[in-house]
Amino acid sequence: LISLFVSKRLPALLHSEVPATAIAAAILAFCGTAFALPFGKTYPEVAIETGHIEGQATEGVEAYLGLPYAAPPIGPLRWRAPQPPAPLKGLKQAFQFGPACPQIPSKDVKLDEMSEDCLTLNVWAPERRPGKRAPVMVWFHGGAFENGASRMPIYDGHNIATHGVVMVTLNYRLGHLGFFGHPQLTEEAAAEGVPTANYGLLDQIAALQWVQRNIQAFGGDPSNVTIFGESAGGIGVLA
């Protein structure tokens, strides 16, 4: 069922292991659909580096969806390395997934669900315990670097979070917007002293940096992060 499934610990970070049951649950959950039932919701608030966000808690798991981890890669930021996100205005309700990055429409991702302003991630966190930090798992979706999105139901992280893990999924630029190479872009990047090409992989790195800076707010341990992915997502892990 899984063409290339790779799990990797971030180097020199971890002191405790992600529970084996959580790894198994992650694999099984991403081979089938996992949905949280909308009963008994509460609305927790969390302060992150860009402002305050409000999530939804169901069955002991808090969900925060569509969180920008980088500025919209449009206009002068198209075909550029990801830049920091702007501060939030007021309390942001993180109830909806962000749009998918542009790609050929499919049964999984419709055209009206896409936007170039797509660099968002989602966090599912178990109930926080004072003095305790939960291990973190970050998922890179597959799709040949041409399609896929974190909003797809198969990537819902609720069930994994019930195993005591903070679960993160994310979008990254795809196709010609994520992996376009051209001599002019190379020259411009060299003149500016910034990275060029493989923008989708740079997005993944930016998301991991966001996790390092912010995951404690959700009860996660930034020194205990596992990245994993399937197909193109597995290649991203290896990269």
How would you name each of these model-derived features?
Residues A20-T33:
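Bacterial N-terminal signal peptides
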Residues A36-Y199:
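Non-catalytic accessory segments of hydrolases
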Residues L121, N214, F228-S231:
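Serine-hydrolase catalytic core recognition
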Residues G219-E230:
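Alpha/beta-hydrolase fold nucleophile elbow
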Residues E230-A239:
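Glycine-rich nucleophile elbow surrounding the catalytic serine of serine-hydrolase chemistry
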